[in-house]
Regions:
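Sec-dependent signal peptide recognition
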Residues: 2-9
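Sterically constrained small-residue positions within well-ordered secondary structures
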Residues: 9-11, 130
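N-terminal signal peptide c-region/cleavage motif recognized by signal peptidases
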Residues: 13-15
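Mobile, glycine-rich extracellular loop/lid and propeptide segments
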Residues: 19-164
Length: 167
């Protein structure tokens, strides 16, 4: 199993209200959170900022994790949820405040019984992703419909296919 490590502030986890629903924080892909008020040069230092934990996932992570605070998960209650997509064609939902806990849910788009498997990295023109290529790009959360969209690569009957999928 691979571990997804993350860096964040204890203060950030307890007071964050920002949603991260797409790559680089917004549809313009600015990579900036211009309304950030919690993190400052004074509190982002080795004493108050650093790794808080690691989440177990089944493959490498290249996609930016997404975040929704105070999300109601049916049968599981309200959680600050971290969504993580892997190169093993999986999407996870974790309680962001409890990295040692199992995922709130996990979806795999592979189906060995139907011949749907991962794409070996050797079958692609992408040498820096190893050993398999699955969900590389950051998914998108559509808050209006409650849908997570992800683009997964998988092999079906030994043929490379690209599928637009949603959860």
């Amino acid at each position: 199993m691979k571990l997804l490590s993350f860096l964040c502030s204890t203060l950030l986890l307890t007071t964050i209200a920002a949603q991260i629903t797409t790559s680089q924080y917004d549809n313009q892909r600015t990579g900036a959170t211009l309304t950030e008020r919690t993190l400052t040069p004074q509190n982002v230092n080795p004493k108050t900022f650093g790794k808080l934990g690691a989440f177990k996932v089944d493959g490498a992570v290249y996609a930016q994790p997404l975040f929704l605070p105070a999300l109601d998960i049916p049968g599981k209650g309200r959680h600050d949820v971290l969504f993580v997509a892997t190169e093993h064609d999986s999407v996870y939902a974790f309680d962001a405040d409890r990295p040692a806990d199992p995922p709130l849910w996990h979806v795999s788009f592979l189906d060995q019984a139907r011949g749907i498997t991962t794409v070996p990295a050797s079958d692609t023109q992408c040498p820096f992703i190893q050993p398999e290529v699955g969900i590389t790009s950051t998914p998108v959360l559509d808050l209006k419909t409650g849908t997570l969209y992800a683009l997964a690569r998988a092999m079906a009957a030994h043929t490379l296919t690209l599928s637009l999928i949603h959860i």
